[in-house]
Amino acid sequence: MRVLFIIAVLALISVGCYASEMKDRSSRNEVLSAIFAIEEPQERDCLGLFWICNYMDDKCCPGYKCERSSPWCKIDIWG
C-alpha cells in the first residue's frame, strides 16, 4: 500500500513539473518570437550603419556619412 502511495505521489509531481515546463516553454517562445519580429529588416530610402555606399551620392541615413576613403556608411562624429 505504501509503495502505491509513493508511486502516485511521484506521478503527480511528474505531471506538475511537466505542466510547469510547458507553460515556461510557451512563455519563452513568445518572448523569442517578439524579439525576432522586431529585428526584421525594414525597407527604407537610406543606408544604415556599415552598408556599402557611393560617396558621390551619399545615401546614408541621417547621422551617418560616406567618404571616399571608406565606402561604407559610418557614424558622422562631427555632425
From Swiss-Prot:
Record bears the keyword Coiled coil: no
PTM sites of type Tryptophan amide: W78
Keyword Signal part of the UniProt annotation: yes
Keywords: Amidation, Disulfide bond, Ion channel impairing toxin, Knottin, Secreted, Signal, Toxin
Expression (tissue specificity): Expressed by the venom gland.
Subcellular location: Secreted
Annotated propeptide span(s): 20-44
A single Gene Ontology CC term: extracellular region
Signal peptide (UniProt feature, chain positions): 1-19
Disulfide topology: C46-C61, C53-C66, C60-C73
Molecular function via GO: ion channel inhibitor activity; toxin activity
Similarity comment: family membership: Belongs to the neurotoxin 10 (Hwtx-1) family. 35 (Jztx-27) subfamily.
Described purpose of this protein according to its UniProt entry: Probable ion channel inhibitor.
UniProt domain comment: The presence of a 'disulfide through disulfide knot' structurally defines this protein as a knottin.
Protein name per its UniProtKB record: U24-theraphotoxin-Cg1a
Species assigned in the record: Chilobrachys guangxiensis
